[in-house]
Amino acid sequence: MSNIPTELKYASSHEWIRKEEDGSYTVGITEHAQELLGDMVFVELPEVGDTVTAGDDCAVAESVKAASDIYAPISGEVIAVNEALEDSPELVNSDAYGEGWFFRVMPSDETEVDALLDAEGYQAVIDEE
């Protein structure tokens, strides 16, 4: 069974977000998603300054098995990207909720966070797959 930290919020498309002290949100993919994808070989990230819209694809994770679109869980401006993934995409596999984060977003509508799933709700999504 995948690790699903209770302090994070989740999208049914297998992304997680964590609120940071500056009001931004860090975005990554869940441990469950990286297990399904397998060993990461390349991650394409949005650019700092890009505007992302909740539910729209904004990044790509390529593994030995497949390429998968990554969707923005919330709308806002990308304020940082995890440049370490350029040389070490395997960080997504080894530390999905830590060093394997994808990008940070300053939200344009923080109420979108309320529409995301808690850990229990995300577990229910996995159970239905």
UniProtKB/Swiss-Prot annotation:
Binds 1 lipoyl cofactor covalently. It comes from the Bacteria. Residues 24-106 form the Lipoyl-binding domain. Transmembrane segments: none annotated. Gene3D superfamilies: 2.40.50.100. GO terms for biological process: glycine decarboxylation via glycine cleavage system. Keywords: Lipoyl. The modification N6-lipoyllysine is found at residue 65. GO terms for cellular component: cytosol; glycine cleavage complex. The keyword Transferase does not apply. InterPro entries: 2-oxoA_DH_lipoyl-BS (IPR003016), Biotin_lipoyl (IPR000089), GCV_H (IPR002930), GCV_H/Fam206 (IPR033753), GCV_H_sub (IPR017453), Single_hybrid_motif (IPR011053). Its cofactor is (R)-lipoate. The glycine cleavage system is composed of four proteins: P, T, L and H. HAMAP family: GcvH. The glycine cleavage system catalyzes the degradation of glycine. The H protein shuttles the methylamine group of glycine from the P protein to the T protein. Belongs to the GcvH family. PANTHER family: GLYCINE CLEAVAGE SYSTEM H PROTEIN, GLYCINE CLEAVAGE SYSTEM H PROTEIN-RELATED. This is Glycine cleavage system H protein. It comes from Shewanella sp. (strain W3-18-1). The lineage of its organism: Bacteria, Pseudomonadati, Pseudomonadota, Gammaproteobacteria, Alteromonadales. The gene is gcvH.
